[in-house]
């Protein structure tokens, strides 16, 4: 029985590693993972492990909310309020992307919408400005900044055509 459990554990770890490797080997993969870790139904538990794997050590997060209040902190500090399961469902989805890449660095302007369900109207929109670098055969998120839409709408160049 122990042998069977050990084999199952090894298979699940290898599967997780393969999935994570796919997530970070392309810009598409890492940006998709970036949104997947925060989105889920009521009771969803934030995917801390994947979030740690997509961010570089010491990655910095900067956020301007809809009132233009400023926050700047580390990924570890971002995790603190997410320790409990979600009280309501939350889906943050990418609606448009502008990517600029040169060598081992890339910058992604990612317009997002937040919704209570995947088929509901967004209750909030904004732009994530995501800085990436490629090292050791994979992409890393070095930093990201978020600006929630307020009185100033998201510019048309960052919206779907």
Task: Show the residue positions of the predicted features.
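A short, polar/proline- and glycine-enriched secondary-structure boundary/capping micro-motif
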Residues: 72-74, 118-122, 151-158
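Surface-exposed, charged secondary-structure patches
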Residues: 23, 60-61, 69-119
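N-terminal, post-signal-peptide region of Sec/Tat-exported proteins
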Residues: 42-70
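Short, low-complexity N-terminal intrinsically disordered segments enriched in polar/charged residues
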Residues: 16-49, 53, 160-161
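A mature extracytoplasmic/lumenal domain signature
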Residues: 65, 110-114, 128, 145
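Sec-dependent N-terminal signal peptides
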Residues: 3-13
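Short beta-strand edge/turn micro-motifs at domain boundaries
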Residues: 125-155
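Residues that flank catalytic or metal-binding motifs in active/ligand-binding sites
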Residues: 55-57, 95, 126-128
């Amino acid at each position: 029985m122990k042998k069977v459990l050990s084999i199952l554990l090894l298979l699940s770890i290898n599967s997780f590693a393969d999935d994570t490797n796919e997530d970070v080997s392309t810009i598409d993969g890492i940006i998709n993972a970036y949104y997947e870790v925060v989105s889920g139904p009521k009771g969803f538990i934030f995917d801390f492990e994947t979030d740690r794997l997509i961010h570089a050590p010491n990655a910095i997060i900067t956020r301007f909310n809809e009132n233009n209040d400023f926050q700047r902190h580390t990924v570890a500090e971002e995790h603190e309020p997410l320790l409990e399961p979600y009280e309501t469902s939350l889906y943050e989805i990418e609606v448009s992307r502008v990517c600029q890449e040169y060598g081992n660095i890339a910058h992604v302007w990612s317009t997002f919408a937040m919704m209570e369900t995947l088929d509901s109207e967004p209750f909030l929109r904004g732009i994530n400005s995501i800085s990436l670098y490629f090292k050791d055969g994979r992409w890393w998120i070095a930093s990201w900044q978020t600006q929630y839409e307020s009185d100033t709408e998201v510019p048309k160049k960052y919206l779907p055509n």
